[in-house]
Amino acid sequence: MPDLHRLALSALQYRPVGAQSGNASSAAASCTGDYMAGDSSLERDCGRLADGCSFPQVRGSATGVSDQSLGGSIHFSNAGRDEYVVELGRLLDLTDGVAQPKKLFDLLSAFAFKFGCKWLAYGPLTSDHKALNRVKCDSEEILNYPDGWRERCLEMGYETIAPVIKESRMGAGPIRWSDMYSDASTTEYERRMFDEAAMFGLRSGITVPLRGPRGSCAIMSFARHCEREFHDRTIAYLQLAATHFHLRVAKIANLNAVQKIPALSLREKECVLWVARGKSSWDIGVIMRISENTVNFHIKNVMRKLGTSSRTVAAIKAISLGIIEL
């Protein structure tokens, strides 16, 4: 937790650029949910986000504004910067001890919502061309994208061609969707995916590649209803929160895996170890100075606990689970 706090403090060193004229001022009045130093009411922020940012699609936007362009319109005080740290610290405190991924996702969603991000999606990053295998916990998916957009993705196969997925596999940092849209390597079909996402309300977003223990790889996407670029500072905080979430989920998965490993007695471990070394029940009995029947009794218990029908398979499974070592 202290490491994340230090990273959060370093993220505050960024200072917004000067004011821009024109549409930036009017946009600031309608879509300021990204700055906690302004209106602290989440409900009012969301109202502006929903009512004030009704851009039709990503392509060809001449009036799009960024967090940087709003820097001159909104006075981001030191107290406001401190509030970012407070909110991140609150997220870390609230997630401490939580053992349900869906609950962790709900807490992360509430945190991201304060940055104007209504939509989130998390899932493992596979090595093949299947982009995002939806993670399920208690029969619920760890994403809150609109149902219509999820159905459209499945219908069109967008989950397998998303350019942010390809970029994430390269080990890049946070990816702005707008950058991928304008990238020369992005095809028209892939741009169409972004255009259609905007029609369903996902008008701007970022995707964060995540790395965890034992090589676990995942991605987390944050999307806004408002067509406005993400400030570098905002991305830094969302990346910290997403990384914390991923590490917590990975830890829970590891704990669950450990809990599912059957507990064998010392005698059972010793018997199955000798089975793995090719010894018969009679041989094991001589080595352990117990009867052959007692050896068979222990081996049958091992087979039952490991859910196998053969002693050889039981030995192999015991090795793979780390119960015994040759």
Swiss-Prot record:
Domain of life: Bacteria
DNA-binding region boundaries: 281-300
Pfam family, one: Autoind_bind
GO biological process: regulation of DNA-templated transcription
Keyword annotations of the record: DNA-binding, Plasmid, Transcription, Transcription regulation
CDD domains per the UniProt record, alphabetical: LuxR_C_like (cd06170)
GO MF: DNA binding
SUPFAM superfamilies per UniProt: C-terminal effector domain of the bipartite response regulators (SSF46894), Pheromone-binding domain of LuxR-like quorum-sensing transcription factors (SSF75516)
Location of the HTH luxR-type domain: 257-322
InterPro entries hit by this protein: Sig_transdc_resp-reg_C-effctor, TF_LuxR_autoind-bd_dom, TF_LuxR_autoind-bd_dom_sf, Tscrpt_reg_LuxR_C, WH-like_DNA-bd_sf
UniProt entry tagged with the keyword Repeat: no
Similarity comment text for this entry: Belongs to the autoinducer-regulated transcriptional regulatory protein family.
UniProt cross-references to PANTHER family, sorted A to Z: DNA-BINDING TRANSCRIPTIONAL ACTIVATOR DEVR_DOSR
Name under which the protein is recorded: Putative HTH-type transcriptional regulator y4qH
Organism: Sinorhizobium fredii (strain NBRC 101917 / NGR234)
Phylogenetic lineage: Bacteria, Pseudomonadati, Pseudomonadota, Alphaproteobacteria, Hyphomicrobiales
